[in-house]
Amino acid sequence: MATDWQPECIAPQHQSGLENIGHHTDRALQNTSGNVQSYSDAILHGGMSGRDDHLQHLAYKYSHAPVHPQPMQTATTLHPHHILNARVQAKKLRRVQSLGPNHAGARRGRSYLKSQKYLEYRARPRRDTGKDGEPVWSDELEDAFQQALEANPPMGRRKWSERGKSYGRNELIAEYIYKVTGKKRTRKQVSSHLQVLDSFLKGDPDWERLVREQPADRSGNQHQPVGPKWRTSLDHPLPSHYGGHMHATYHDHLSPVQPYVGELPPPHYTLGSNMHERSTDTIHGFNFDMWVSAPQQANQGDKAFHVYTCLQGDQYHPVAPPMPLENVRDWRTTFPHLNSVMEELDGPLDCEIILLEASLKLMNDFPPPGSKLGIQLDIDFAPPGMTDATVLSQMDNWTCSTYIYEDGNRLSKADHNLARPLSTKVKPPFESSWWAKLFTELTQDKQMAEKSGRHQNADDHIRQFFRSLSAVQEIRAISQNSRRVSQGSGHPGDCSKRMAILLWKFRQTLPDEVGLTTWRKLIPPPDRTMMNSPKPATGIDLPPLSLDSILLKPQPPNVYQNPQGHDLLHQNGTSQPHWPLYPPPHESMSNMYHSTGSFDFLNSVSKAEDGLPDRTAVTSILDSFPAMPPQETSQPSSLNVSSGGPVMLNVHDMSLSHHNLAGYALSHDNHYVPSQQHGVSVHDSSNVLNNIFGPGSQPMDEIGNSQSAWGPPIPSTTIPSDVGSNHYTHLPYHHHDHQTSASRESHPPNGFEGLMGPDDLMDKIVGSMPDDPGMNGAGPDHASAAYADTNATEAVQ
């Protein structure tokens, strides 16, 4: 059954609009199951109690004496409905006084808000509507208007200059209303509203103070600046605007800002934010539906076999006011394409960002054979009542790019060319083929899990998948003027204009829920050039440090204890003089480490950046068995100190063919010695050992033939957390708890010092070795049976 609604049976991307939304049963459920409705819906449907719930924002504005709890007297000629509204208004004012913060000293009380005429005006039904389809001065806008009067005191005929432009008081009030509500009202509408209110409030002292400049304000004794109060500077970001005081409901964003308690009211927003006026490319409406239609049914959402999700509320009224983009949690990782767009911008974003949150109600079984998946997505660029949008008639070559992500990792990308809109609506596709395949796979996985008894695990997995799912849609178009300019200049280039960016977040519904989709506008961050904010920092991968830079790094003080003596090389019970681990530089072993004419044992130590796969391992100077298989006798090619402490050692590309013969110690400046070039053997073991380790070292012949000379393996000196438990064994030494010092005998000067250079010395040593197979392990063709039978040497895992 699953194959009957695979992508080849998918309905076209664009379905006809739903003519009667209210007739659908699932849509009827959405009005009762959802508790988030738009502000205007609650007003128009007479939900007075719903209006009461949205008036907490008045708390910080209307601070005056409590109103007597008796019902307010009204004119007998008023309609009973108006009387009820007046009583509700009095109740709102009492609630405002009980919830308001204690900053009444910052502003005087406004008695006109309690006046009979003003309350009657507020209770009057709103008949005139604006271009956005809402009442011109709804309760929401009226509250913002009253707040704007307080924030922008009278200036007379003077202007407020900002960013090279002059603003009158009515323009500042209109801009303030737009900032706090997202709804535009013009300067003339503000002026007309002031005249209406002034017709019945004239003479009230508090009203006169807010609408007319007082004589004291014009006198020379007053030094208060003329202009909007509490206006933030252009040189500072907008913490109140992006600080999270906007919430899901329409009016919580007007609640008092916590840092501004006492005598400071909420701060005003600057004209510097990029909420600039948009008239031609503003999105006014949005519609989205996703459903499955049966084979014999019309492929329409209102006759669907199953509805995955549908739009909640009115398509022209989002459920919440505009919210700053920075309030969306982890938006840079959730929507990577938007993050790249914002980083490439040189100025403010020139299009609107819409956040859509869709809850999907999945099916428990496959649909009937021949079913079709339908997706309808409409974006309206014109206010209600308008049949033509100027921006759409001037734009063509519409495109839509869709990016789908899981935990920020892209799952799908598709580019589509859209038909030129014939109305005010644009209908971008939403990858119905991808969704059909996804729903089929999820249904299959769910049924398989139920058969195996893992129903709960499958449900949790699906829910987690949808929580991690996100999508970005970028809609672009080319204006006719831009195309003509581009063609005339001879540089076609990309002259398309970004029209909208849609951000999608998903989740799976609970068992008793219906799938709903909500939308709201997002406010992009201010321009970096204006707000002086740097771009987000990105990670930088640094190259590995070389061995030289690590060794030259100065050691922090008091990291190591004072040098303490203990035997690193045990000489048959003979005590050895102590050699400090970190002697002063002038006491270093010049015979071994001097830069000129010395025998440098560090020539074979490569730098840290030389990787293991790129170099041939170098055997130890004491390697007497070069012919042994590397997989049996090789040692780790690098030893690194633990990251938990100071860096002491970092040696790469060193292979030890016989770890029981590797006598290593830490010398001055943290050098790890000794090591030699590949294939070097020692003929006169006594002389070489005496020259390197002093007299009394065990002869090479005894080491090669005697098993008892090694005795039981003694734990080696290892560096914690780098070698692990499978460490190799050094020459015998007495165990000591400290790794900060080592003992070494004082040996006589090397007989070869000063007589010849390192190369001549090496040639002399190698040239003096005979190819005698009876050399007890020193010859190249000699095989030691004793070594083959013992387990003294094991490869480090």
Swiss-Prot record:
Keyword annotations from UniProtKB, A to Z: Activator, Conidiation, Nucleus, Sporulation, Transcription, Transcription regulation
- Report residue spans for region: Disordered: 696-797
SMART domains for this protein: TEA
Composition skew (Polar residues), residue ranges: 716-726
Q: Where in the cell is it found?
A: Nucleus
Superkingdom as given in the UniProt entry: Eukaryota
Q: Which residues bind DNA?
A: 130-204
Gene name as annotated: abaA
Q: What is the lineage of its organism?
A: Eukaryota, Fungi, Dikarya, Ascomycota, Pezizomycotina
State the protein's name.
Answer: Conidiophore development regulator abaA
- Please name the source species: Aspergillus fumigatus (strain ATCC MYA-4609 / CBS 101355 / FGSC A1100 / Af293)
What family is reported? Belongs to the TEC1 family.
Disruption phenotype annotation: Results in the formation of aberrant conidiophores exhibiting reiterated cylinder-like terminal cells lacking spores and causes delayed autolysis and cell death. Reduces significantly expression of the gliotoxin biosynthetic gene cluster including gliM, gliP, gliT, and gliZ.
MF-aspect GO terms? DNA-binding transcription factor activity, RNA polymerase II-specific; RNA polymerase II cis-regulatory region sequence-specific DNA binding
